[in-house]
Amino acid sequence: MDLQNILENNDRVFKFLEVKILDVKPGYSKIQIPYKEEFCRRGNVLNGGIIMTAIDFAGGLATLSVNDGIDQVTQELKVNFLEPMYKGPFTVEGKVVRKGRTAVIVQIEFRDSEGKLGAIALGTWYIIRDRVVKKEGG
């Protein structure tokens, strides 16, 4: 089973956003999300939380491509919103800036269908080596 199917079958947010994985290679990821009215705020522009969630997925996939541990979690995510986004589909690219033993730093860009930069982010993902993060008792 490929990564696209694994995430669609095991991550409800990934499935809700209709994320499509376009590319994943060491230190890099590229995903796409559609424009949907359900994702928009007043004025029919993409909601900032949707943008941040897509950015988190792209950064997480870039991290996964270099993760030599068992699991990972987002430790920090800083997003600068530059332009309102309403021309989908949207592409989100994550590039690993630095990989350490316990942390991976990723720069992420969010663009519209015309290539216009709508948001830029810098995130830190914590590498977990001894367990998988899950709900207690579940």
Swiss-Prot record:
CDD domains: PaaI_thioesterase (cd03443). Pfam families: 4HBT. It is an enzyme of class 3 (hydrolase). GO terms for molecular function: fatty acyl-CoA hydrolase activity. SUPFAM superfamilies: Thioesterase/thiol ester dehydrase-isomerase. Belongs to the thioesterase PaaI family. NCBIfam families: unchar_dom_1 (TIGR00369). This is Putative esterase STK_00610. It comes from Sulfurisphaera tokodaii (strain DSM 16993 / JCM 10545 / NBRC 100140 / 7) (Sulfolobus tokodaii).
